[in-house]
């Protein structure tokens, strides 16, 4: 049961990390107009 939990958490964290990394890496370059969604500093 512990091995199943570890493998599930590993897969979940892997996909979440890849998704967040890809989103943060590609979003500002593809949609520069959406930079205000990250946090308006102006």
UniProtKB/Swiss-Prot annotation:
GO cellular component terms attached to this protein's record: photosystem II reaction center; plasma membrane-derived thylakoid membrane
Subunit and interaction comment: PSII is composed of 1 copy each of membrane proteins PsbA, PsbB, PsbC, PsbD, PsbE, PsbF, PsbH, PsbI, PsbJ, PsbK, PsbL, PsbM, PsbT, PsbX, PsbY, Psb30/Ycf12, peripheral proteins PsbO, CyanoQ (PsbQ), PsbU, PsbV and a large number of cofactors. It forms dimeric complexes.
Transmembrane segments annotated in the record for this chain: 6-26
Protein name: Photosystem II reaction center protein I
Record has Transmembrane helix as a keyword: yes
Biological process terms in GO annotation: photosynthesis
SUPFAM superfamilies given in the database record: Photosystem II reaction center protein I, PsbI
UniProt keyword annotations, A-Z: Membrane, Photosynthesis, Photosystem II, Reaction center, Thylakoid, Transmembrane, Transmembrane helix
Membrane topology designation: Single-pass membrane protein
PANTHER family: PHOTOSYSTEM II REACTION CENTER PROTEIN I
Segment forming the signal sequence: none
Protein location: Cellular thylakoid membrane
InterPro entries associated with the record: PSII_PsbI, PSII_PsbI_sf
Pfam families linked to this entry: PsbI (PF02532)
Function (record text): One of the components of the core complex of photosystem II (PSII), required for its stability and/or assembly. PSII is a light-driven water:plastoquinone oxidoreductase that uses light energy to abstract electrons from H(2)O, generating O(2) and a proton gradient subsequently used for ATP formation. It consists of a core antenna complex that captures photons, and an electron transfer chain that converts photonic excitation into a charge separation.
Lineage top rank: taxon: Bacteria
Family: Belongs to the PsbI family.
Chief location category: membrane
